[in-house]
């Protein structure tokens, strides 16, 4: 089995941070790191007739890409939309729910007792399905 990189570990820690946030908001997590030929859906959750596909970007500093926001450009959005369509084709019982694409930006923060992760921004409806 390949060894985990520090970037993979940081990404998973960021996803765990967002997962906890969503659960505290009453969302039920349906899938995490769901993969298909189009890519990966970091988190899929539902609540009260809504379904969200959440892309999580975790950064250790400000960086050049606005805490990860610029990493979710048009091509990434198209891959996420295709992955969401694949997810829905495998879960037809969810296909009638209102769907939304959110982006969560997580910061890695150094501290006296090691690093911690905090939700820096959560963008509901960060992009829409368009053809």
UniProtKB/Swiss-Prot annotation:
Pfam families: UPF0102 (PF02021). It comes from the Bacteria. One of its GO terms (molecular function) is nucleic acid binding. InterPro entries: Restrct_endonuc-II-like, tRNA_endonuc-like_dom_sf, UPF0102_YraN-like. Transmembrane segments: none annotated. Gene3D superfamilies: 3.40.1350.10. NCBIfam families: PRK12497.1-3 (NF009150), YraN family protein (TIGR00252). HAMAP family: UPF0102. Belongs to the UPF0102 family. This is UPF0102 protein CYA_0708. It comes from Synechococcus sp. (strain JA-3-3Ab) (Cyanobacteria bacterium Yellowstone A-Prime).
């Amino acid at each position: 089995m390949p060894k985990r990189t520090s970037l993979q570990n940081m990404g998973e820690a960021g996803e765990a941070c967002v997962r906890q946030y969503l659960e505290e908001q009453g969302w039920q997590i349906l899938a995490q790191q769901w993969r298909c030929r189009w890519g990966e859906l970091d988190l899929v959750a539902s609540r009260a007739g809504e379904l969200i596909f959440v892309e999580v970007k975790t950064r250790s500093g400000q960086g050049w890409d606005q805490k990860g926001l610029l990493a979710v450009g048009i091509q990434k959005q198209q891959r996420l939309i295709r992955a969401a369509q694949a997810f829905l084709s495998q879960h037809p019982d969810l296909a009638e729910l209102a769907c939304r694409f959110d982006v969560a930006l997580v910061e890695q923060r150094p501290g006296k007792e090691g690093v911690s992760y905090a939700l820096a921004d959560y963008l509901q409806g960060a992009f829409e399905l368009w053809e």
